[in-house]
């Protein structure tokens, strides 16, 4: 009897682990144009990113794990990147967390990636913090 119970518990644990790992959603930025939007204060910028910059962003975002949370970082669709109809809101402070509007989930960049992204967006007129 004990053996049967242990085996059942083992199967349940394995099933829950498989479900957990199989349900992990990852960022997949669509190929093509990425539009940078920065509408803050008196600034109203909507610009297509260069192919090179779009590829940098795509490589940075793709395969990042999406998760549900309520981070304290401030997000707005007025400070965002749009790719293939997907909107990625950039934290208005210096936080390395981004919000995927379409997935209603968040993902993180490393400190180096966050710094690279903010420098890249500076070329398009973005300024941080913008809270």
Regions found by a protein language model. Give the residues of each.
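Bacterial N-terminal signal peptides that target proteins for export
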Residues: 1-10
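C-terminal motif of bacterial Sec signal peptides marking the signal peptidase cleavage site
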Residues: 19-23
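Function-determining sites in protein domains
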Residues: 24-131
